[in-house]
Swiss-Prot record:
This is Large ribosomal subunit protein uL13. Signal peptide: none annotated. Part of the 50S ribosomal subunit. The lineage of its organism: Bacteria, Bacillati, Mycoplasmatota, Mycoplasmoidales, Mycoplasmoidaceae. Coiled coil: none annotated. This protein is one of the early assembly proteins of the 50S ribosomal subunit, although it is not seen to bind rRNA by itself. It is important during the early stages of 50S assembly. It comes from Malacoplasma penetrans (strain HF-2). GO terms for molecular function: mRNA binding; structural constituent of ribosome. One of its GO terms (cellular component) is cytosolic large ribosomal subunit. InterPro entries: Ribosomal_uL13, Ribosomal_uL13_bac-type, Ribosomal_uL13_CS, Ribosomal_uL13_sf. Keywords: Ribonucleoprotein, Ribosomal protein. PANTHER family: LARGE RIBOSOMAL SUBUNIT PROTEIN UL13M (PTHR11545:SF2), RIBOSOMAL PROTEIN L13 (PTHR11545). GO terms for biological process: negative regulation of translation; translation. It comes from the Bacteria.
């Protein structure tokens, strides 16, 4: 009878890879799903839910992301300062133009599990607004998404 194998922390640390995704003309939700799976390690054969077996991920050209359908005009993002009358509202178009990195970060973070492990997973995510990134020394492999 074949037994289930689990990955140890030491083995998971040895198998970390670096990936880069170009976010140009990609839909936000589809990008976030793929990114969360890579960060979590679900694309690997030896996935273990309680071990950080995911890889590092770099997302470039975040300002060229696309929201599906008419969400750029219809959806609103809200922040509150904590003071009376401190509610601020931002449209999807403004979020893409000015805060595209925070938009992608929030979408990916929302798709990770809500536990202690997710704090370690989200630290392996690097988002840049243009094509230049600081992790060239790690020789990241490029992933093409449709």
């Amino acid at each position: 009878m074949q037994k289930t194998t689990f990955v140890k922390n030491e083995a998971a640390l040895a198998n970390k890879k670096w990936y880069v995704i170009d976010a140009s003309n990609l839909i936000l939700g589809k990008l976030a799903v793929e990114a969360a799976n890579i960060l979590r390690g679900k694309n690997k054969v030896d996935f273990t839910p309680n071990v950080d077996c995911g890889d590092y991920l770099i997302i470039i050209n975040s300002d060229k992301i696309v929201l599906s359908s008419d969400k750029a005009d219809r959806e609103k993002w809200y922040t509150h300062s904590g003071y009376i009358g401190g509610l601020k509202e931002k449209s999807g178009r403004l979020m893409i133009e000015k805060y595209s990195d925070k938009l992608i970060y929030g979408a990916i973070k929302g798709m990770l599990p809500k536990n202690t492990l997710s704090r370690y997973l989200i630290k392996k995510l690097f988002i840049y607004k243009d094509a230049n990134h600081k992790q060239a020394a790690q020789k990241p492999m490029e992933i093409k998404l449709n």
